[in-house]
Amino acid sequence: MEVTVSNLSYTFSPKQPLSLDHVTLDLPKGSRTLLVGANGAGKSTLLKLLSGKSLAKAGHISVGGKDPFRESSSAFVYLGTEWVNNPVIHRDMSVARLIASVGGDKFAERRDFLISILDIDLRWRMHAVSDGERRRVQLCMGLLRPFEVLLLDEVTVDLDVLARADLLNFLQEETEVRNATIVYATHIFDGLAEWPTHLVHLSLGRIVDYGPISKFGALMTRSSTGNSALLETCLEWLKEDKKNRGTREEEKRSTWDDVQESLKVGTDVFTDYFKISRAK
């Protein structure tokens, strides 16, 4: 499905700056788009709006010709970091039961393949797994049903190198064989040099640049540092973002001297713990 965004603006509060500022995008069906931007650039906000989890009050969003907020579909899949904080998936239950609850029997072949590439042990108990293992289960559950649009927000952060590489290969095949569309926000660029078909650079809620990978010709070659040219380019973008962000916000930032007086007032049991433990 094609993903189209036109003149999209969004703020969490009228008193706050825009989290997204007149964003316009057109991502074709079957594309693999990498969202690049510093923390606070608006990547997560954009993905949640595309998934229909939040209402776009200014501008227009179309996913496969539909408004994702008003016309939700099981073909639209959003996977974000907040899932691991859900108390339900920290209970003493088997991984097999959890996977079965979302259609594990209906998509048996796909289930077995995902369990294999994500290296999931069906004997795991959810209350006793690591963060990385819990993330693998989330990905298996989220990818179990064939999707048409997949929105990923930092969900590979807990995966080891092998699991992440196998997952990226699987996702690439999904776009090439089934013509699915993927939008992926991450700060981990290892192994991505030849993965994306499109790049989007977000900074302070605005699109700095975007387009097919062919538009960024230098990315197709390797840099002299040994890093992929994609990684080097993203690093340069993020450095420039930080520089611009600092210039615009410098007057708003407090110095350590500014907050000294507030530290003298009152007490806190949590910070007192650190004072005592570090004093030993």
Swiss-Prot record:
The keyword Signal does not apply. ATP binds at residues 37-44. One of its GO terms (cellular component) is cytosol. InterPro entries: AAA+_ATPase, ABC_transporter-like_ATP-bd, P-loop_NTPase. PROSITE patterns: ABC_TRANSPORTER_2. Keywords: ATP-binding, Cytoplasm, Nucleotide-binding, Nucleus. It is found in: Cytoplasm; Nucleus. This is ABC transporter domain-containing protein C20G4.01. GO terms for biological process: nuclear-transcribed mRNA poly(A) tail shortening; regulation of transcription by RNA polymerase II. It comes from the Eukaryota. GO terms for molecular function: ATP binding; ATP hydrolysis activity. PANTHER family: SKFA PEPTIDE EXPORT ATP-BINDING PROTEIN SKFE. Residues 3-229 form the ABC transporter domain. Its main location: cytoplasm.
